[in-house]
Amino acid sequence: MYAVVQVRGTVKTRREIKDTLKMLRLHHINHCVLIPDTPAYVGMIRKVKDFIAYGEVDAKTLEELLVNRGRLVGDIRLTDEYVKENSQYSGISDFAAALAGGQARLTDVPGLKPVLRLHPPRKGYKTTKRTVQQGGSLGYHGENINDLLYKMR
């Protein structure tokens, strides 16, 4: 399961980049989506790698994101009681563990919005014009995406 965060805006970009970000449901900077590891999604991520930060998210970070930033339709916070009543999972932590392991999907909890609206990272991005290998924030973070998501909680 990949966590994908939009880091750069789409002004003066090619139409196909904008369309791919729209297909990934990334409409604003600092929004995050959770994407399964399939060839179609990996190709989409590869196309917009210069506008996003992405990597493999772990269960602990995913649980914290769902508790703090998970929203239902109507901008209602996601709670353990709602997850227990409306899905087969016993709570947010159980759902996050299944989601990180690939056994669950976001649609298993009805009414859960697919986009997590995050804060800008505390202490800021390193730079939004360079890749991670060059000392920036763009591109593939691997397991270090959890550090970025923690700063954006």
Curated annotation (Swiss-Prot):
Keyword vocabulary terms for this entry: Ribonucleoprotein, Ribosomal protein
CDD domains: Ribosomal_L7_archeal_euk
This protein's name: Large ribosomal subunit protein uL30
HAMAP family linked: Ribosomal_uL30_A (MF_01371_A)
Protein source organism: Methanospirillum hungatei JF-1 (strain ATCC 27890 / DSM 864 / NBRC 100397 / JF-1)
GO annotations of cellular component type: cytosolic large ribosomal subunit
Family: Belongs to the universal ribosomal protein uL30 family.
Lineage start: Archaea, Methanobacteriati, Methanobacteriota, Stenosarchaea group, Methanomicrobia
Subunit structure: Part of the 50S ribosomal subunit.
Single GO molecular function: structural constituent of ribosome
InterPro entries reported for this sequence: Ribo_uL30_ferredoxin-like_sf, Ribosomal_uL30, Ribosomal_uL30_arc, Ribosomal_uL30_CS, Ribosomal_uL30_euk_arc, Ribosomal_uL30_ferredoxin-like
Lineage top rank: taxon: Archaea
Record-level GO BP terms: maturation of LSU-rRNA from tricistronic rRNA transcript (SSU-rRNA, 5.8S rRNA, LSU-rRNA); translation
GN (gene name): rpl30
PANTHER family registered for this protein in UniProt: 60S RIBOSOMAL PROTEIN L7, LARGE RIBOSOMAL SUBUNIT PROTEIN UL30
